[in-house]
């Protein structure tokens, strides 16, 4: 979460202190004394895991609970714009690669492949933007090219494809091949 370069050493120290304070407050607010998250949603667990906000001693417990919440929904995500982009990352970064693939490959509603089965060539704003009978979810707020759910593409090229940016050099110095 922390930038790699700063203009001054003092600025770096300030940001490191701020980060430590944010993590501490997050943990005090969203974890109880037994290591359970106070918000029992998929998104809360995803955010805590993906952004490194989970106390290390409770990491496995948090991952286990996230998989339980996923199982409770028959392997479906019930997340929105905050949790969806990081769901498969949170799973795969914590040893649950199979669950991440299973989530990606679900074909029934709500899922990415549900949209594909409905004829989608882009990622929709709503999982059921177009229903099986051809009617629209709603004429309002029904984009058929939407970012949040489309963020699965990043997980696909980084994790499935193994393509990562080389942050150690400037872009014009990088070569593929």
Which residue stretches match the model-derived regions?
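Active-site core of glycosidic bond-cleaving carbohydrate-active enzymes
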Residues: 1-175
């Amino acid at each position: 979460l922390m930038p790699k370069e700063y203009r001054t050493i003092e600025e770096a120290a300030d940001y490191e202190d701020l980060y430590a304070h944010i993590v501490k407050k997050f943990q005090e607010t969203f974890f109880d004394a037994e290591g359970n998250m106070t918000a029992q949603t998929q998104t809360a667990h995803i955010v805590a895991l993906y952004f490194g906000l989970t106390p290390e001693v409770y990491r496995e417990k948090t991952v286990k609970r996230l998989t339980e919440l996923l199982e409770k929904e028959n392997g479906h995500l019930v997340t929105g714009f905050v949790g969806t982009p990081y769901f498969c990352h949170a799973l795969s970064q914590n040893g649950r690669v199979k669950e991440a693939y299973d989530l990606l490959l679900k074909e029934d509603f709500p899922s990415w492949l549900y949209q594909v089965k409905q004829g989608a060539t882009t990622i929709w704003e709503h999982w059921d933007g177009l229903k099986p009978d051809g009617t629209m979810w709603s004429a309002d707020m029904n984009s058929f090219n939407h970012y949040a759910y489309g963020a699965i593409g990043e997980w696909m090229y980084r994790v499935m494809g193994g393509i990562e940016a080389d942050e150690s050099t400037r872009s014009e110095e990088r070569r593929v091949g």
